[in-house]
Amino acid sequence: LEVLLYYAAPRGDTNPTAHALLSRFGTLDGVFSAPESELKKVNGVGDAAAQLIRLVPQVARRCLMSRSAQIEILDTTSKCGQYLLPYFHGESEEVVYLLCLDAKCKALDCVLIHRGGVNVASIAARKVVKAALDANATSVVLAHNHPSGLALPSPEDRQTTLVLKAALEAVGIVLADHIIVADDDFVSLRDDGILEDPYEL
């Protein structure tokens, strides 16, 4: 961390700043996941340092995405979860993605649907349906994260799942799963019994 900060302040002593960041955010992961506005509250962290720190998880996310893209057939909860995990790496707020699949369960696209709180009102069904139709998807997997909690479905998650399932069915598209991510863990609402297994139909 000290070496990284040096690139933002090459003439300064970055050791105290590195220690201050770790003291405030607890771990390296905490530092790299912190919002830019919170990073700049630490003495010695200016715009350049905050932007550089926030760049690290973005680069890591891209590297992990390129690795997960090697999973060709996404026909199980495990494969879908592993494919989607990198999209949430380093995110400090809730984000929603829609993984669009063709008839052979190959990824067509993974679309950012929403950033912010997850509920029926915030995730417009028409936006999800449009993204699925634009990708010419046969089925889709909805995914969102719980950045400060456990990967467990809330009542709102279940309600959102059922609303979107009905909206997608109306245009002939299967909601194959709704995956919830927290850190490096994920759970499936299909495995939870909220959705039928489309691969057993």
Question: For each predicted feature, which ranges?
Answer:
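Charged, compositionally biased N-terminal leader segments and the immediate start
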Residues: 1-8
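A short amphipathic alpha-helix within small helical-bundle interaction modules
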Residues: 21, 28-42
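Charged helix-capping and loop-helix junction motifs
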Residues: 124-126, 155-162
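Divalent-metal-activated hydrolytic enzyme cores
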Residues: 115, 162-201
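Long, charged amphipathic helices and adjacent flexible linkers at domain junctions
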Residues: 60-81
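Histidine/lysine/aspartate-rich catalytic loop segments that bind and position anionic ligands
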Residues: 81-135, 139
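Short acidic, glycine-rich surface-loop motifs adjacent to enzyme active sites
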Residues: 138-148
